[in-house]
Amino acid sequence: MIPQLIVGLGNPEPKYDQTRHNIGFAAVDALARAWNISLAENRKFQGQYGEGTAPGGVKIRLLKPLTYMNRSGQAIQAVTSWYKLSGESVLVIYDDLDLPLGKTRLRLSGSAGGHNGMKSAIAHLSTQNFPRLRIGIGKPKNAVNGDNSETVSHVLGKFSATETQLMSLVLQFVVECVELSLKQGVEKAMNRCNSCTVEAPKS
């Protein structure tokens, strides 16, 4: 399956810019820059939306839902309904606490794994069978099992200067993985995306 709509999950207010939870937004911004696609607010689609041509001549649509994370599925459904896209043609990019920094995971299907944005996407697409690319944001250093406040402040916190350098390399790698999935299909891209660890630049 070749994705036709790529969605990055995040929260819309400026205070959430550059936070770990908004790495999905940052990924779509990186794709838009790489492919020269301009994103603009689209009320019908409840998000920032743009379309253009990705490498290989593939027509692609990009979306950043502006509904807040736990209602992301509304915006995704608005686009898929309008363009009559199947759920399987949607690639969703989002943050994952359980993956360390520098790791990414591309899968063809699966559960939400506790991620509210993905819960909403699954509910509105009425299927778990759509590809997703998870970007590792790591766990909080002082996490205690069951301490939700530590997790929330970590997820909604910003990357350190060193982490920001690493994440810019991760986003370059994400662009590479997505381009591979558009040219050769998600299955082929999974081997590359899931086997590599992006290393921090040597100081």
UniProtKB/Swiss-Prot annotation:
Keywords: Cytoplasm, Hydrolase, RNA-binding, tRNA-binding. It catalyses: an N-acyl-L-alpha-aminoacyl-tRNA + H2O = an N-acyl-L-amino acid + a tRNA + H(+). Its EC number is 3.1.1.29. The keyword Cytoplasm applies. Belongs to the PTH family. HAMAP family: Pept_tRNA_hydro_bact (MF_00083). This is Peptidyl-tRNA hydrolase. The lineage of its organism: Bacteria, Bacillati, Cyanobacteriota, Cyanophyceae, Nostocales.
